[in-house]
Amino acid sequence: MIFLTLEHILTHISFSVVSIVITIHLINLLVNEIVGLYNSSEKGMIVTLFCITGFLIIRWIYSGHFPLSNLYESLIFLSWNFSIINMLPYLKNLKNHLREITSPSTLFIQGFATSGLLTQIHEQKILVPALQSQWLMMHVSMMILSYASLLCGSLLSIALLVITFRKSRSVVGKRNKFLNRIFSNIQYINEREKILLKTSFTYSINYYRSHLLQQFDFWSYRIISIGFLFLTIGILSGAVWANEAWGSYWSWDPKETWAFITWTIFAIYLHIREKKNAEGVKSAIVASIGFLIIWICYFGINILGIGLHSYGSFPIS
């Protein structure tokens, strides 16, 4: 009973803290960056990380096995991975927009995990025979690590596409209208001053947008590369485990099939990135497709509850 109470407290503290952190990020987006608020958001994510870590440790001690036996535990572990990724810029003493991606992801995943939809699988149960193996921790942890990394990298690619398309469509039009309105009101200024004003204004916007796109592209590529490595290790370890449990390395189970599709999509992404001048839109489109594929592989199969991996599903009725 004590363990369950502690789990309940830690999950709700972490959820509340992440909510506050996201509010701080929104304030920073609406007004000029406030150093005190930025530091508070960093400390808030540290608190969240410790709370989720405490939850996993308590769950591990209470159950006697690593907490990755069902969808609820894997979602908490997934949010823990997002918290780890969120801390990477902090450890390197960098300020970028990675937290605007990871913080809402942590909130969404943990909010869903602690919602009423999964109450039936919150309680600990005896592991089914197929999961009573030393491969549980190796295989499932690698897969969840890969999901977290690939989802984060894909979200950065989606953000890159949104900014790029806004730049090519709406932003240019709005900027031209704004400049035309300015120039109509300052006709008395000489031509040299007009050109200087236009150049300065356009350059400042383009420089900020270009820097933002470079950051998204930089972090997206590196996080996806790490996630692809985790995914490869997870699939290989899963094949070895499957051979021990079911007598076959590969059965084209729905989960295995979609894991292979996910691996193929991000292999294509990395192949595109190997080409010269491949940064930007083309690879980001592939990563965006991969974002949907990951959710089908991870979550969609659990909803259907079919195949050899159905023990990780939850009832939807």
Swiss-Prot record:
Pfam families the UniProt entry points to: Cytochrom_C_asm
Native source organism of the sequence: Pelargonium hortorum
Family: Belongs to the CcmF/CycK/Ccl1/NrfE/CcsA family.
Quaternary structure (record): May interact with Ccs1.
PANTHER family cross-referenced by the UniProt entry: CYTOCHROME B_B6 PROTEIN-RELATED (PTHR30071:SF1), HEME EXPORTER PROTEIN C (PTHR30071)
GO biological process: cytochrome complex assembly
Superkingdom in the source lineage: Eukaryota
InterPro entries documented for this protein: Cyt_c_assembly (IPR002541), Cyt_c_biogenesis_CcsA (IPR017562), Cyt_c_biogenesis_CcsA/CcmC (IPR045062)
A Gene Ontology cellular-component term: chloroplast thylakoid membrane
Described purpose of this protein according to its UniProt entry: Required during biogenesis of c-type cytochromes (cytochrome c6 and cytochrome f) at the step of heme attachment.
Name the record gives this protein: Cytochrome c biogenesis protein CcsA
Cell location: Plastid, Chloroplast thylakoid membrane
Parts of the chain that traverse the membrane: 17-37, 44-64, 71-91, 101-121, 143-163, 223-243, 252-272, 284-304
Keywords: Chloroplast, Cytochrome c-type biogenesis, Membrane, Plastid, Thylakoid, Transmembrane, Transmembrane helix
